[in-house]
Amino acid sequence: MRLLQLLFRASPATLLLVLCLQLGANKAQDNTRKIIIKNFDIPKSVRPNDEVTAVLAVQTELKECMVVKTYLISSVPLQGAFNYKYTACLCDDNPKTFYWDFYANRTVQIAAVIDVIQELGICPDDAAVIPIKNNRFYTTEILEVE
C-alpha cells in the first residue's frame, strides 16, 4: 500500500515538468497556418462613368499549392471587364495579384470571392490540395459614386 502511495504522489519537479509541457502544447496549437490571406483594394469614391481598377492580392501560408478561382460580385450590374474570372495555382512562395477594370455610374457594393477548386492542368504535376474546413473566402468594399 505504501509503495502505491509513493507512485501516485507527484513531486514538485514532476508538476513543473507537466506544466511546462502543457504550456508548450498550447503555444504550438496557436501556430496555425492561414489558408487564404487576401487584400482587396478599390478606390473609396469615383465620379460617374470613371474607369475603376479593382486589385485583389491573394496568398497562402500552407505548404501545399491550391487551385483558386477569383471573381467579383456586385450589388448592381457593372460594365467592362468586371465579369472576368481568373483561375491560378496559389502556393506559399508565389502570391497572386488579380486586376479588374470596369465602369460604375452609381454607388455599389463589391465582393471579391476566392474559391479553392479542383481543376486539372493549373498547378504543376496537378499537385494541389483542397481545404476541408473552408473553400470559399470573400471580402467586400463599397464604391461610392459622387
From Swiss-Prot:
Compartments it resides in: Secreted
An example Gene Ontology CC term for this record: extracellular space
Alphabetic keyword roster: Disulfide bond, Glycoprotein, Pyrrolidone carboxylic acid, Secreted, Signal
Molecular function (Gene Ontology), one example: identical protein binding
Signal sequence coordinates: 1-28
Subunit and partners: Monomer. Interacts with AZGP1.
Protein name: Prolactin-inducible protein homolog
Phylogenetic placement of the source organism: Eukaryota, Metazoa, Chordata, Craniata, Vertebrata
Recorded name of the encoding gene: PIP
